[in-house]
Amino acid sequence: WAIAEILPRRSRLARRAPGGGQGERIVAANVDQVVVVFAAANPEPHRRMLDRFLVIAEANELAARVVINKVELVGGADAARERWIDYARAGYPVHLTSAKRREGLDALRGALSGVVSVLTGPSGVGKSSLLNAIFPGLDLRVGEISESVNKGRHTTVGGYLHPLPGDDGGYVADTPGLREIGMWALAPESLDVCFPELRPYLPHCRFADCRHQVEPDCAVRAAVAAGEVSGARYESYLKLRGELEEQ
């Protein structure tokens, strides 16, 4: 076999190179959706890190969905649902799953079938365990949580594209767990459109270049004050905007 032609990527998921680097790191290419997996506990989830993943997906114009695994550690899906309601209200499909108890797997299997997905998220949240539970033939290696730092150990050390069984087919890329996630090539003034729940309000700000901080007649701040937009997500926007402006 020989490579005859390299076709352009139709999509990509890119982040800043780790370790404070300034380069671009391609996580996956030619995918249809990004599936961001976090644990309900063990390791403790950090919402701002989840927001970073979602902003990167939005900036790369990729559909995203959220999976909260290990819900058995917090009393089940009903107990976990309220903590993550902000993401459902923002328009993201949210899957509450337990690979251990095989809960919530059918809906996630349906979301993965027939498309090319990339699973990403921190180490130790159960990405490989989820894939093994949904598609037993994959037989992926799984790891444990370090008791000393409450963080996952890497068990997936490279990105792998797995064909999915079944009539609908599809592929899933299982990527190594990430302990840091940096945004790449995103202008600070473009951040607000990467928060779907802010988009309806952006045309109604008095100033076209509104930063949604202290400007008068800011429709975004008015929506937050009225409870129409999550205060936690808005605070995350402000934090991430500050980081982008410092880069």
Model feature map: region roles:
Residues A63, K70-V125:
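Canonical P-loop GTPase G-domain recognition
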Residues I6-V27, V31-Q33, L62-A64, V71, ...:
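Helix-rich effector regions associated with P-loop NTPase G domains
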Residues A2, Q22-Q33, N42-L62:
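Switch/coupling subdomain of P-loop NTPase systems
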